[in-house]
Amino acid sequence: MDTQEQQQKTAPRQDPAKSTLPQPGRPVPSRAYPGALIVVEGTDGSGKSTQLYLLKRWLEIGGYRLHFTEWNSSPLVKSATRRGKQRRLLTPTTFSLLHAADFADRCERQIMPLLQGDYLVLADRYIYTAFARDAARGCPPRWLRNLYRFAPVPDITFYFRAPLDVAVQRILSGRPKLKYYEAGMDLGLSFDRSESFRLFQGRILDEYDKMVDTDNFVVLDGTIPVNKLQKQMRHIVKSSIDLSRFAPKKGARKPR
């Protein structure tokens, strides 16, 4: 064996550049960090975004350190997703990978650093959105789970469940026209967009229901009055998370 070959074999391995993300294949609960992660999930029209906004305002009034993030909002990926939708080029797998790239970017730049920085992170939809929607489009559930294994596990995952007809009616009554992918038209379920949307949302609802026990969802009734539902949500947050960890600013009112 010559000297050059021996040096190559004995040379120490160079570690790749470090990332703020946990290593792939090793999911790390958010409780491993000083911060806390609260997530809302549910079908379109379930009321999840409204409730998270109200919770966010309540915590902001209290002066707590928090950060809000929402699904499919990374500026790095958003334009590519938009172009793919406009040209109707997205297959279920391509769509799923774009969403995963979007989430990975936000996870590394926002979610993980803020959890490490002792912040309360509020997420309007999380990896369970991909598990439900992408599985409804035919992506293998196990493949999806592996794709997002780097994601920290939420401290609380609220699942706002509303009957299919109620949720669909809320969306249809507030939208002049459903978008192509939103309605699930790429799946060939129906030529009618409203009917395709109903069928697609039914598939998504079924996928969400499968995750209730395995992913420790806190199920809330999306049909009860907004104020009553918000009270339930706040009570669960206060009883599950020590909000004093997030140091209200001096002079700010503490949430009741």
Regions found by a protein language model. Give the residues of each.
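Conserved nucleotide-binding/hydrolysis micro-motifs of P-loop NTPases
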Residues: 73-75, 127-128, 162-168, 226
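NTP-dependent small-molecule kinase module
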Residues: 2-31, 56, 172-256
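Walker A (P-loop) phosphate-binding motif
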Residues: 30-57
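A glycine- and Lys/Arg-enriched "phosphate-lid" helix/loop adjacent to the NTP-binding pocket
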Residues: 130-203
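Hydrophobic residues at beta-strand termini and immediately following loops
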Residues: 69, 160, 220
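Hydrophobic "anchor" residues on beta-strands that sit immediately upstream
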Residues: 37-40, 120, 157
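ATP-dependent small-molecule kinase phosphotransfer cores
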Residues: 60-152
